[in-house]
């Protein structure tokens, strides 16, 4: 399955976890001027959405996989991806109460990133009673997300309220219609082996 993908070590590889109907992946690939060197991989567990994307998308630089990204991502070699995108992941992969379940998966994602590769997370916060989300609650949640992923080795590069303006998926478009009760955040994390080594060195020096 993985071996059938035609990208080389010099290729730029972009992966979307849970691509849905593939509209975002397709748009990113179409806007990419490096069709012969950049390769896009979409992973979707829902067979109906996967088949819809497979019928519609015919770009040579896109490969689609039907299955759980939790099972598929570990199959790829380490230091393979330039960018991994997760758009509004299922609560099983981002909810505070389920951190023990999903933290190990994102550590795998980290290992699959090339040095200086990045992981873009777009997720949302809602209230159980569907009340508006206050700034205090929102910023506390964003800080928790940021520090949680940094504890795994990721480096926080950028954070921006909402989803990127040029991103469109069924859920993103729906959530944009209710920004007070559904508050999204886009966090972009990086992987820098040298920076992490320097941080480890400084920590050990401080302990001495």
Task: Indicate where each model-derived feature is located.
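Conserved beta-strand signature within the Rossmann-like core of class I S-adenosyl-L-methionine
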Residues: 116-124
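Class I SAM-dependent methyltransferase SAM/SAH-binding core
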Residues: 23, 28-63, 70
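A short SAM/SAH-binding and catalytic strip from SAM-dependent methyltransferases
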Residues: 82-100
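Class I S-adenosyl-L-methionine
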Residues: 131-208
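A short acidic, Gly/Pro-enriched loop at the edge of an enzyme's catalytic core
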Residues: 74-83
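A short glycine-rich, Lys/Arg-flanked "PGG" loop and its adjoining helix->strand segment in the class I
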Residues: 100-115
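Class I SAM-dependent methyltransferase "Motif I" SAM/SAH-binding loop
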Residues: 18-22
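Conserved alpha-helix/loop element of class I SAM-dependent methyltransferases that forms part
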Residues: 1-10, 27-30
């Amino acid at each position: 399955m993985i071996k059938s993908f035609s990208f080389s070590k010099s290729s730029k590889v972009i992966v979307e976890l849970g691509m849905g109907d593939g509209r975002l992946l397709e748009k990113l690939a179409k806007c990419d001027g490096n069709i012969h060197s950049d390769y896009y991989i979409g992973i979707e567990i829902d067979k109906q959405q996967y088949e819809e994307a497979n019928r519609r998308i015919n770009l040579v630089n896109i490969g689609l996989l039907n299955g759980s990204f939790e099972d598929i991502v570990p199959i790829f070699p380490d230091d393979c991806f330039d960018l991994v995108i997760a758009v509004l992941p299922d609560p099983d992969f981002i909810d505070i109460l389920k951190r023990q379940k999903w933290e190990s998966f994102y550590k795998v994602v980290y290992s699959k990133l090339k040095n200086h590769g990045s992981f873009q997370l777009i997720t949302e916060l809602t209230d159980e009673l569907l009340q508006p989300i206050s700034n205090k609650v929102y910023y506390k949640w964003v800080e928790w997300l940021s520090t949680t992923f940094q504890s795994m080795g990721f480096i926080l590069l950028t954070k921006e309220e909402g989803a990127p303006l040029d991103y469109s998926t069924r859920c993103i478009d729906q959530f944009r219609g209710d920004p007070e009760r559904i508050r999204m955040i886009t966090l972009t994390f990086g992987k820098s082996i040298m920076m992490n080594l320097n941080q480890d060195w400084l920590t050990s020096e401080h302990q001495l």
